[in-house]
Structures are given as structure tokens and as C-alpha cells.
């Protein structure tokens, strides 16, 4: 069966949604890995911060968990007509860490879900 990384971009309704998806997937025999971005130490990305401090330790863990999954499910609310800062920041860190970050994203099935309100 498949391994699905479920990315919870916030720690409220979308985390509950992510946990519910995990239950359903596991009941169907899949492996689910709920990734709580709000609990990860990913400071706001800036070039100066990156040069001065390097990449945060949690970035390696995030990369590994995403790379190990066959597909991703992103649970994120709409924030002011866009995506939440936690999700944008995580993607930004991922895109600056490795020589070919696109290999992590290309060809991987991704689904989106939201609970907003």
C-alpha cells in the first residue's frame, strides 16, 4: 500500500482534518505520516538568516518525510486569498536547501484539502 505524507499547515481545523484523513487512510491499509508544520522549527526564511544560521535542523527531517512518501495531501486554509505563511515558508526552505529541489516535487501526486472559516 501507499505511504502518504499529510501536511497540516495550521494547528487548528486543518490539523484535525489531517488526522481524520490519516485515520481513513490507515483503515484502508495505507501508511499516513501527519506533518505538523506549526510544530517544526522553521524560522521565517530570509537570505540573510540562511547565510548567517544555515538551514534549520527540522528541514532535513521535513525533506526526509516528504521524500519517503508516495504522495502528499496538503491540509491548509485560505489566508487572505492565498496560502498560509507556514506552508509558503516550508516550501521556500525546501526550495533553497538542495541542488535539485525540484526532484522532491516533480512527478509526485498531491491533493489539497481545506477547512476554513
What is each model feature region?
Residues 12-19, 52-61:
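Short N-terminal helix-initiation segments at or just after the protein's N-terminus
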Residues 9-11, 37, 115-117:
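Cofactor-binding loop segments of dinucleotide-utilizing enzymes, especially the Rossmann-like FAD-
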Residues 2-30:
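N-terminal beta1-alpha1 ligand-phosphate binding loop
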Residues 12, 40, 81-82:
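Short alpha-helical
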Residues 37-56:
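N-terminal beta-loop-helix "entrance" segment that forms/cooperates
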Residues 19-22, 47-50, 87-90:
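Short, glycine/charged-enriched secondary-structure capping and boundary segments
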